Curated annotation (Swiss-Prot):
Coiled coil: none annotated. It holds the Pfam family tRNA_synt_2f. This is Glycine--tRNA ligase beta subunit. GO terms for cellular component: cytosol. The lineage of its organism: Bacteria, Pseudomonadati, Pseudomonadota, Gammaproteobacteria, Alteromonadales. HAMAP family: Gly_tRNA_synth_beta. The gene is glyS. One of its GO terms (molecular function) is glycine-tRNA ligase activity.
Length: 689
C-alpha cells in the first residue's frame, strides 16, 4: 500500500484567541475520526493554528482504502432449492443481485443451519476522492456557538474564510471547504513577508510559511518561543516575568510572528497595590508583569508585538502610552477610596440587591457575620474577628477600584482593611473569602478566613435552595456547584470539626422567614453529598468506595474524608475481596429476617467450632476497635477487621446460619449482625466491587 502526507489549511480572518486551541484540537479530532471511519490508515496527525489559519498535517496517509472481502449471506440452503433440487426464485434473485449464479455461491454452515453465501471483493476507494468531504464534515462539527455569514455567501463559520488548501503530497486535491475551492494559495503575514504564495508540497507547509510568509504556524512552537524570550527579557532587567499559562495561550493566539519587547511605567504607580496594576496589565493589555526576587512588582512589563519593526522603540513607546492612562486611573481610584473606611461603606450595601427574596448585600453581610462567628466558635478561631470580617466582607464592592477592576474584589478589600487598621486576620479574610475560586485553587487556611468563606458559601446555598432556585441541568447561575465543592474542600483540607447538618440549620435560621422551600435544608445536604461523589471521582477514587461511605451518611466532611481514605486503603489489602463478599452475604441474610434483628449473643449456644472461633475473634477485637472508632482512626480499624477473614470464611464453610432450631438460628444471626456492625462503623463494604 502506498502512503503520502496530507496538509489541509483553512485561511480565515482573525479567529477568537480564547477559542483557537479548542477549534484546532476539535478539527483534528473530528478529521481523524473521519479517517478511522473510512478505514484509511495513517501514521500520525497534528494540528497547527495561528490567528488567521487552522491546519492539519497527517503523515503516511494511505492513498486508498484497503480492499475488503464482504460476506453477503443469502437464503438458507433449505429454502434456496425446491423439492427437485432446483434453485428457488428467491435464491436466483439473491445471486443475480450479487452478480453470480446460485451454483457459484459458497456454503456457510453454522449452528443454526446452512446458508448460501457470497464473499464479495470490494475494492478500496481512492483517498483523494474522500478527503474534501471528510474535512468539511470535520469543520461542520466544530464547537462554534455563534457562526457568522460574510459577503453573499450562505456558508457560516466562526470568521470569514478566504482560502482553502488540500495537498496530498504534491497533488492538489479538488474540492471545496466552506464554499472555497481548494487551491495552492497560502496567505502570509499581514505586514511582513509575501502576502500569499503557492505551496508546492504538503511537507513544505511549516518551512514555507516561516520563510516566505513570516508566520510561525506551529502553535506550541510559537508559545514556547514567547515564553523563552519573555523569561530572557525579564532576566535582563533583573526580574522574573509573571507568565500565567492562560495569558500565554491567549497571547500566542494573537500573534503569527511574535517579537518580545520590554517597556516601563512611572515608579509613582507602584504606590498602588500591585494586584490592581497587574490586573490592568494582564487583563486589559495582555502584558506580562515583572517582579524582583523578593516578589515586588517592578516598573516594567513585557509585551509581544506581531511584527518585526525597524524602530522597536516606537512600538514600546506606543504601548507605554496605552497603559499609562489605565495605571493613572488605578492610582486615582486608590487614592480616592482611601478617604473612606470600609465600615463607612456599610450603608451603601443597602442600595444593592443580592436577590429579590433574600434581600440586599447589607442583609447578606449581616447573615455572613453571624454565621462566621458561629463557625469560628466551633473551630477555635477568633469569633470577634470572624464576625467583623463577615460584616465588612462585601464593602469593597462599593469602592471605585473594584467597580472598575472587578477581578480585584476581595484583594482590594484586604488592602483597604489594613489601611483602616483592621486586624490582619480580618484583612486576610477579606481576600480569602472567595477561595477556592476555581478547580485547583488553594483554600483558606487561617481560621477566620475559613469561617467567613464557609459562611458566605453556605448562606448562598441555603438561600437559593430556600427560594426554590436549585441548579437544573447544566444551568447554575449562582455557581452553587462551585460553592458546594468549596465548602467541602475548606472543611476537609483544614480538617475542621464541622457538621453539615448543624451548619445548614444555622444558615437557615439566619434567613428567618424569607425562605419559601420547606425542604431547603434536606435538599442542600443532598446537594453537598452529591458533590462529595463528583469530587472524589475527579480525584480518582472508585465509585464503589464512595458509595460504601455514602451508605453511612456521614455529615462531617473531614470524617467523610477519613472514611474514604480508610476504605481505599482497605481495598488494597489481600483480605478485602473476601470480606466484601462475606459482608454482602451477611447483608442478604439479615435483610430476609422479619422484625427486629437479634443482638444478644449467647455463648452457650455457640455449638460449632467455627462460630466459636468467630465470636472469640470479635470479642478480642472489640476492645481494640472501640477507641479507634471514637478517634475516627478508621484505617487502623479496618486493618484490624481484615484479620477476621479466615474466621469468617470458616464460619460460612462450616455453619448453617438458618438452623431449624430457632435459638441457634437467632444466636447466629446476632453474631452476623455484630460482625456487620463493626464494619458499618466505617462503611458498608458489602458495596465494594
Amino acid at each position: 500500500m502506498n502512503f503520502e502526507n496530507l496538509l489541509i489549511e483553512l485561511g480565515t480572518e482573525e479567529l477568537p484567541p480564547k477559542s483557537l486551541r479548542k477549534l484546532a484540537e476539535s478539527f483534528l479530532a473530528n478529521f481523524t475520526e473521519e479517517l478511522t471511519k473510512a478505514d484509511l490508515a495513517f501514521s500520525s496527525a497534528v494540528w497547527y493554528a495561528a490567528p488567521r489559519r487552522l491546519a492539519i498535517n497527517v503523515t503516511e496517509l494511505a492513498l486508498a482504502q484497503a480492499d475488503k472481502v464482504v460476506e453477503k449471506r443469502g437464503p438458507a440452503v433449505s429454502s434456496a432449492f425446491d423439492a427437485e433440487g432446483k434453485p428457488t426464485k428467491a435464491a436466483e434473485g439473491w445471486a443475480r443481485g450479487n452478480g453470480i449464479t446460485v451454483e457459484q455461491a459458497e456454503r456457510l454452515v453454522t449452528d443454526k443451519g446452512e446458508w448460501l453465501v457470497h464473499n464479495a471483493k470490494v475494492e478500496g476507494v481512492e483517498t483523494k476522492s474522500l478527503i474534501a468531504a471528510m474535512a468539511q464534515r470535520a469543520l461542520d462539527k466544530l464547537p462554534i456557538p455563534k457562526p457568522m455569514r460574510w459577503g453573499n455567501n450562505k456558508t457560516q463559520f466562526i470568521r470569514p474564510v478566504h482560502t482553502a488548501t488540500i495537498l496530498l503530497g504534491s497533488e492538489l486535491i479538488e474540492g471545496e471547504l466552506l464554499g472555497i475551492k481548494s487551491a495552492r494559495t497560502v496567505r502570509g503575514h499581514r505586514f511582513m513577508g509575501l502576502k500569499q504564495f503557492e505551496l508546492a508540497h504538503a511537507d513544505h507547509y511549516l518551512a514555507d510559511l516561516k520563510e516566505k510568509g513570516k508566520v510561525i504556524a506551529d502553535y506550541e512552537s510559537r508559545k514556547a518561543l514567547i515564553k523563552a524570550d519573555a523569561e530572557k527579557a525579564a532576566a535582563k532587567i533583573g526580574g522574573t516575568a509573571d507568565i500565567e499559562d492562560s495569558l500565554l495561550e491567549e497571547v500566542a493566539s494573537l500573534v503569527e510572528w511574535p517579537v518580545v519587547l520590554t517597556a516601563s511605567f512611572e515608579e509613582k504607580f507602584l504606590s498602588v497595590p500591585s494586584e490592581a496594576l497587574v490586573y490592568t496589565m494582564k487583563g486589559d493589555q495582555k502584558y506580562f508583569p515583572v517582579f524582583d526576587n523578593a516578589g515586588k512588582l517592578l516598573p516594567n512589563f513585557i509585551f509581544v508585538a506581531n511584527i518585526e519593526s525597524k524602530d522597536p522603540a516606537q512600538i514600546i513607546s506606543g504601548n507605554e502610552k496605552v497603559v499609562r492612562p489605565r495605571l493613572a486611573d488605578a492610582e486615582f481610584f486608590f487614592n480616592t477610596d482611601k478617604k473612606h473606611t470600609l465600615e463607612s461603606r456599610l450603608p451603601s450595601l443597602e442600595t444593592v440587591l443580592f436577590q429579590q427574596q433574600l434581600g440586599t448585600l447589607k442583609d447578606k453581610v449581616n447573615r455572613i457575620s453571624a454565621l462566621a462567628a458561629f463557625i469560628a466558635e466551633q473551630t477555635g478561631a477568633n469569633a470577634v474577628d470572624a464576625a467583623r470580617a463577615g460584616l465588612l466582607s462585601k464593602t469593597d464592592l462599593m469602592t471605585n477600584m473594584v467597580m472598575e477592576f472587578t477581578d480585584t474584589q476581595g484583594t482590594m478589600g484586604m488592602h483597604y482593611a489594613r489601611l483602616d487598621g483592621e486586624t490582619e486576620a480580618v484583612a486576610v479574610a477579606m481576600e480569602e473569602q472567595y477561595k477556592p475560586k476555581f478547580s485547583g485553587d488553594t483554600v483558606p487556611s487561617a481560621g477566620v478566613s475559613c469561617a467567613v468563606a464557609l459562611a458566605d458559601k453556605l448562606d448562598t446555598l441555603v438561600g437559593i435552595f430556600g427560594i426554590g432556585q436549585a441548579p437544573k441541568g447544566a444551568a447554575d447561575p449562582f455557581a452553587l456547584r462551585r460553592a458546594a465543592i468549596g465548602v467541602l474542600r475548606i472543611i476537609v483540607e483544614n480538617k475542621l470539626p464541622l457538621d453539615l447538618v448543624t451548619l445548614i440549620a444555622k444558615a437557615q435560621e439566619l434567613h428567618g422567614t424569607h425562605l419559601s422551600n420547606a425542604n431547603a435544608s434536606d435538599e442542600v445536604l443532598e446537594f453537598l453529598m452529591a458533590r462529595f461523589r463528583a469530587w472524589y471521582q475527579d480525584k480518582g477514587i472508585g465509585v464503589d468506595v464512595i458509595l460504601a461511605v455514602l451508605a453511612r451518611r456521614p455529615t462531617r466532611p473531614a470524617d467523610f474524608d477519613s472514611r474514604i481514605n480508610a476504605v481505599s486503603h482497605f481495598r488494597s489489602l489481600e483480605a478485602s475481596g473476601a470480606l466484601a463478599a462475606a459482608n454482602k452475604r451477611v447483608s442478604n441474610i439479615l435483610a430476609k429476617v422479619e422484625g427486629a434483628l437479634p443482638t444478644t449473643i449467647d455463648a452457650s449456644l455457640l455449638t460449632e467450632a467455627a462460630e466459636q472461633a468467630l465470636a472469640a475473634k470479635l470479642n478480642e477485637l472489640q476492645p481494640q476497635l472501640a477507641p479507634l472508632f471514637a478517634n475516627a482512626d478508621y484505617q487502623q480499624a479496618l486493618t484490624l477487621l481484615a484479620g477476621l477473614r479466615e474466621s469468617v470464611d470458616q464460619f460460612f464453610e462450616d455453619v448453617m446460619v438458618m438452623a431449624d432450631d430457632e435459638a441457634l438460628k437467632n444466636n447466629r444471626l446476632a453474631l452476623l449482625n455484630n460482625l456487620r456492625e463493626q464494619f458499618l462503623h466505617v462503611a458498608d463494604i458489602s458495596l465494594l466491587q
